Every structure is written in structure tokens, then in C-alpha cells.
């Protein structure tokens, strides 16, 4: 139910949202489908869309400035790992690219085929970046005898709540994988 809501944000993969919007009694309900790809550029684009609907553009610009500052600090910490060869889960691509990793192969979600695993190993990765919520690629790291890390693309793990938390968490996991 959307009773009492003024705005509904959704990612587009929630099958029930269009029907709920259509049948809502609240005819003044604003809805906005957003792209949930966790890259800094996309997150800022989506924040701007939301701010426009909520008439909070000034607050969004202030947040964006803080966010960019924090990202810059995190990238300094990640700079020693820039250019490392990485086999990356599809949903970890935005973070991996932002972190400066050299993505040599992208692993799709779902079951891996023997050919896909062999191809990934042949790329001689320094690291496999998997997604915590749908991990599939540990077998590649084990067989390639390289480092392995799981990252997140939405908050929840270890008290992550904000967009900044996602980047803090993922950055710390990447650094730990090389210790």
C-alpha cells in the first residue's frame, strides 16, 4: 500500500510497483523510477532527480559536494591498487571501475560454466571482485590463485546505511584483500 505516501521511488525491477501505483487511492502520488547502478556518476544523477521532485536541490548540491570529497579521499587510499587485473562480477563493475581496477573480464550473475571459469583463470587476474549478495566467483580466485573480495551494491551489510557507506565498505574490503 502507498497510503500516506507522497513519493514512491523504485528501481524498475519490482514487478508489483506499476500495479500498486495504478490502484493507489492517492491520485497525487508522485512516482520516480531510478537507476540503481552504484557508480558515483549515476548516484549523483539519481539524487538530482529525487531532489528535483522533493524541491531539495540546494541540499542535494551540498550532499554532492561532500560525497565527491569523500570519494576523492577514498580513491587516494585505493591508488596503490589502481591497474590491478580484476575479474569482476557484473554488479561489481561500477565500483571496480571507479576504484581504478583493470577489469579483464566480467562475470555474469548465475551459475558459471566451466568455459567461463577457464577463460577467467586464463586472464591471470590479480583479484576477483564478487558481489556479496550473489557470490559466484570464488572458484575463479581459488583456481587462479589470486585475491578475492566481496563488495556490496546497496546498503545493509555491517551497518551500512548511506551511499557513502557503500563506497567506504567496498574500499575497506578492497584494501583488506591486499593486506
Where is each model-derived feature located?
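Alpha-helical, coiled-coil/dimerization segments enriched in small aliphatic residues
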Residues: 1, 92-119, 150-160
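Acidic/His-rich segments in extracytoplasmic proteins that coordinate ligands and/or metal ions
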Residues: 1-53, 134-147
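Alpha-helix C-terminal capping/helix-to-coil transition sites in glycosyltransferase folds
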Residues: 3-4, 122-124
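Periplasmic-binding protein-like
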Residues: 7-11, 87, 126-132
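Solvent-exposed, acidic/flexible segments
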Residues: 13-14, 36-43, 60, 85-89, ...
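Structured C-terminal subdomain patch of bacterial secreted/periplasmic proteins
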Residues: 41-43, 47-48, 123, 127-179
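Short, solvent-exposed amphipathic alpha-helices that sit
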Residues: 42-46, 87-100
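Bacterial Sec-exported substrate-binding components of ABC uptake systems
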Residues: 57-86, 173-179
Amino acid at each position: 500500500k502507498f497510503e500516506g505516501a507522497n513519493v514512491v521511488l523504485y528501481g524498475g525491477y519490482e514487478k508489483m510497483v506499476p500495479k500498486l501505483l495504478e490502484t493507489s487511492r492517492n491520485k497525487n502520488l508522485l512516482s520516480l523510477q531510478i537507476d540503481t547502478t552504484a557508480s558515483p556518476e549515476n548516484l549523483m544523477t539519481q539524487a538530482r532527480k529525487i531532489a528535483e521532485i522533493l524541491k531539495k536541490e540546494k541540499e542535494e548540491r551540498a550532499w554532492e559536494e561532500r560525497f565527491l570529497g569523500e570519494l576523492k579521499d577514498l580513491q587516494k587510499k585505493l591508488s596503490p591498487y589502481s591497474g590491478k587485473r580484476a575479474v569482476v562480477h557484473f554488479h561489481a563493475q561500477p565500483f571496480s571501475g571507479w576504484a581504478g581496477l583493470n577489469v579483464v573480464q566480467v562475470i555474469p550473475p548465475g551459475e558459471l560454466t566451466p568455459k567461463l571459469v577457464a577463460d577467467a583463470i586464463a586472464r591471470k587476474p590479480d583479484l576477483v571482485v564478487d558481489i556479496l549478495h550473489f557470490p559466484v566467483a570464488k572458484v575463479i580466485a581459488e583456481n587462479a590463485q589470486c585475491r578475492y573480495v566481496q563488495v556490496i551494491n546497496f546498503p545493509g551489510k555491517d551497518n551500512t546505511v548511506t551511499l557513502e557507506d557503500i563506497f567506504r565498505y567496498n574500499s575497506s574490503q578492497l584494501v583488506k584483500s591486499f593486506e
